[in-house]
Regions:
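A solvent-exposed, acidic/Ser-Thr-rich amphipathic alpha-helical stretch
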Residues: 1-75
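Short beta-strand edge/turn micro-motifs at domain boundaries
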Residues: 40-41, 48-132
Length: 132
């Protein structure tokens, strides 16, 4: 967030977000995001990091394409979200711009015959949040 590298995982991220919500007097406030726009592009159409063998593209050019691979499930995506952020519960709270960039990659656990219930199809590989 704003250039800080978080290597400690989800717990470090939660601690940082909680600290952002604190007022100088120590009261935790609500944070309100108003998305004004977003844009998504394919970053890598053939993302294969940790891809199971059965989903890799067959080397035989005459082989019938697998239903799961022809839908570009192997692509990684770049998602950019912009908008306004306000710290405080009411609509009168001061606002500032934000920009959030995500790299989304396929969740290979969802590309099996019986995937886990409520599993997400995409996972966040990288996130870069900037409050401007």
């Amino acid at each position: 967030v704003n250039g800080a590298v978080l290597a400690g995982g989800p717990d470090e991220y939660e601690t940082m977000v909680k600290a952002q919500r604190q007022t100088p007097s120590g009261i935790e406030t609500k944070v309100r995001y108003e998305v004004e726009g977003w844009d998504v592009h394919v970053l890598n159409p053939d993302f294969t990091l940790a891809c199971p063998e059965n989903l890799l593209t067959p080397t035989d050019p005459d082989a019938k394409p697998d239903r799961r691979t022809k839908d570009n499930i192997k692509a990684s995506l770049l998602l950019q979200v912009t908008g306004m952020i306000s710290y405080g519960g009411d609509k009168e709270a001061p606002k500032s711009m934000f920009n959030d960039v995500f790299v989304l990659v396929p969740n290979w656990d969802t590309h099996v015959k019986n995937p886990p219930r409520h599993a997400r199809r995409w996972l966040v590989m990288s996130q870069n949040f900037r409050a401007l």
